[in-house]
Amino acid sequence: MLAATCNKIGSPSPSPSSLSDTSGSFGKGFHPWKRSSSTSSSCTLASGSLSGFSVGGSSRSANGSSSSSAAAAAAAAAAAAAAAALVSDSFSCGGSPGSSAFSLTSGGSGGSGGGGSSGSMSAASPFANEYSVFPVSGGSQEAAAAAAAAAAAAAAAASHHQPVFLSKVHASVDGLQSIYPRVGMAHPYESWFKPSHPGEVSAAAAGGASSWWEVGAGWIDVQSPGAGAALHPGALQGSLHSPLGGYGTDYSAAGLGHFSTGGGGGVGSGGGAAGTGSGGGGGGSHLLSPGGQHLMDGFKPVIGPGSYPDPSSSPLSAGSMLAPTGPLGGSPRSSARRYSGRATCDCPNCQEAERLGPAGASLRRKGLHSCHIPGCGKVYGKTSHLKAHLRWHTGERPFVCNWLFCGKRFTRSDELQRHLRTHTGEKRFACPVCNKRFMRSDHLSKHVKTHSVGGGSTGSTGPGSGSKKGSDTDSEHSPSTSPTCHSPDLLHPPDRNGLE
């Protein structure tokens, strides 16, 4: 009966008839590789003719005689005491001392003829090379002796196979490595853009089924060395022609020929086959160089007079993203002048001096800035004055009065300051002769002229000078009680001459 039961170890569901006599006597142990507790008890049973492991437990005896098995167990107990202690200490988990998660324990029920007897059955499981189940003590002294003998056999067999837990863990790790070959990599795409040998990428792309995390050929068409075109020329033409068509000549020389699009080979309409570095139907350059060059190493910009492609080769090159070479090197004079450390000026005199170079040093020493508007011809000694003058031509008025409900705009800052004095009533310009004060400097200059004119006509200084004074000064801003200003020299010249 036991032999028939052990022959059905591999079966997932043993028949109830074979386990009816043994299922009640054997306890339930913890077996991580089995799901059902009823089927786990049959994994370590074997016939008496096999050798390797022994399972301690109480079996039903037909006649109740167990003296021979007890004597054999007592003889082997002395030799295997140390091994049994080692096994019980190493594989014990909770419960009673010496109990193991990898063992089957007996219940201790007696048979029909006699109770408390146990049979020492040596067994070699079909899983001897994979699983190591260590039996421990049951419910009687005979079971403990049988467990010691089984531990000795297990210690001898432990040198050429692994325990259950270690073997299952190693098997699980190996299975993970076979299922997920890229688990141990530092970068998820390391093997894609940095292969150990040049043919790895092409082999992975040309190989049958690819994993979901691998970059397919739809993103960048990978080509193997010696091929005339890419793997999917249609996808390359549709996805890479428009955005990268203008960079074909530059990156073909850099070793990334798969980005170039062209006509040779029946792929495009430009010059050079798609995927080839030199045009025609020759061998295309690989995605990576044999020296382990990174993918991004080829994306170095190439700046030069011929780096910009023909506008007809790509619709993107004629747009705003790729400007022609003219604006880049168009005005070196303005760029040099901008960082020369002096104020910039675009007047005709300054441009002529810069065009002449060293010969225009005389023009630069003069510092004359002329207006470039035809018909104007005004010349200023400062660039700020010229810029203020140009605002008169353009109509720009950047200076705004912030007084309440005013908001007037002016072309020059001094005009704004003069306007603000009308709000505040400040008169900052005083006459040096009569100490009369004015708001504007031009009004003061006109007033000073009245003193010089009055000196020429000594007799006519009354009403004539008063009318002229009123015309020179702004009556609304001048004080009403201000006396008529006359110079002392003009008032009393005869008396002074008589005193002398």
Curated annotation (Swiss-Prot):
Residues 1-46, 304-337, 445-500 are annotated as: Disordered. PROSITE patterns: ZINC_FINGER_C2H2_1, ZINC_FINGER_C2H2_2. Residues 10-25, 36-46, 305-317, 478-488 have a biased composition (Low complexity). It is found in: Nucleus. A motif (9aaTAD) lies at residues 210-218. Residues 453-467 have a biased composition (Gly residues). A zinc finger (C2H2-type) spans 369-393, 399-423, 429-451. One of its GO terms (molecular function) is zinc ion binding. Gene3D superfamilies: Classic Zinc Finger. Its main location: nucleus. One of its GO terms (biological process) is regulation of transcription by RNA polymerase II. InterPro entries: Znf_C2H2_sf, Znf_C2H2_type. GO terms for cellular component: nucleus. Keywords: DNA-binding, Metal-binding, Nucleus, Repeat, Transcription, Transcription regulation, Zinc, Zinc-finger. Belongs to the Sp1 C2H2-type zinc-finger protein family. Transcription factor which plays a key role in limb development. Positively regulates FGF8 expression in the apical ectodermal ridge (AER) and contributes to limb outgrowth in embryos. The 9aaTAD motif is a transactivation domain present in a large number of yeast and animal transcription factors. This is Transcription factor Sp8. It comes from Xenopus laevis (African clawed frog). The gene is sp8.
